[in-house]
A protein has these predicted regions:
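Catalytic machinery of carbohydrate-active enzymes
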Residues: 1-183
């Protein structure tokens, strides 16, 4: 299929007689909520947010070099930015393998509104092709998403003015240095 998902959706809605003013460029900012308690608890202001996780059955989407990227960011920026992750409920244990602060709300994964606020207010996001990457694209946050051969960024309508994709045939061969250059 050579048409992006949002273009297909727009066409279906138009065929149903619906107004599609915002279909091609959705804005998910309305889902934000106040996360000042979480920010105060973890004591962070400026931060880079990483989403190194993926569904267990879609490991082809998982880039394996997040810890090296964290090392490069830390070496370049020192303490200017906190490096954060926001694991989903099934990713909390996996977050222990990432050298970043895993944000939780009373020991639980953030809800969708908290996650949206965290993403929207970040300095930068680096994400696998996952739900948080799509939220990032549609709240206007700055960032990168990493795509292997599973699909294209165009097909899933993820690239925006502030959010770009790096597309490679094999995510295992995409170096942390190459990703760091795009930050």
């Amino acid at each position: 299929d050579k048409v992006s998902v949002l273009e297909r959706f727009d066409h279906q809605l138009q065929e149903s007689g619906l107004n599609t003013l915002h279909t091609i460029k959705p804005d998910f900012s309305w889902a934000s909520t106040d996360i000042s308690e979480i920010k105060n608890f973890y004591k962070f202001d400026k931060y880079i947010l990483l989403f190194p996780f993926c569904s267990p059955h879609l490991t082809i989407k998982k880039w394996p070099h997040y810890n090296k990227l964290i090392e490069l960011i830390s070496n370049r920026f020192g303490d200017k930015y906190k490096i954060l992750t926001a694991p989903g409920p099934s990713e909390i244990n996996d977050a222990k393998d990432i050298n970043a602060l895993a944000l939780l709300d009373n020991g639980k994964a953030l809800d969708i509104s908290q996650l949206t606020s965290l993403i929207k207010n970040s300095s930068f996001v680096v994400a696998n092709d996952t739900g948080p990457a799509h939220i990032t694209a549609h709240v206007g946050a700055k960032g990168l998403t990493l795509f292997g051969k599973h699909t294209t960024a165009y097909k899933v309508s993820i690239e925006r003015e502030n959010f770009k994709a790096i597309e490679v045939s094999d995510l295992n061969n995409l170096s942390a240095e190459k990703v760091f250059e795009k930050l």
